Amino acid sequence: MKDVGVLAAMTISVLGPASDVDCFFKSVVFFLENGKRGSKYPSVTEKLYCRSLSESELAELKVDLESIRVEFDGIPADGFDKGAFGVSEGNTRLLLNGNTLADIFSRFFKAILDAVECSDAFHEEFNECVPLRLGFTDAPDYIFDVNRPEDLYNSIASDELPFWLR
């Protein structure tokens, strides 16, 4: 299975197989957005899920991720049916021994927030904006995702799969 991760300025952070990443977004939609993607955290479940985020959108992404982490910290992991969200126990990098959903997805929060920090630092230092997006981290697909024009990412309709799930 190909790995998916965060692609940003000076950053390639592997999150895990596509099923893990998809599970994260499905969990946000199911537990926090009442099944309606983008209704509460559009910067995460719409933009990060399938599009590119520009420098001006990173502050909102950071706030939303912190809010999701706080809400996930109140959801016990013992009632979380990972199989229902498409996760295979034999092919996952999720921290399945966590006590809460925040624990299970802690690597995701760290990787994405670190990428936001790197993007901010890169912009300050070089006055250049590199979009933050999700994509494959394995060659050769990584090369295609990094070089894919931003307008292709941003033209994905809400009902279409992101590139990393195709």
Predicted regions and their residues:
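Acidic (Asp/Glu-rich) sequence patches and key acidic residues
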Residues: 1-166
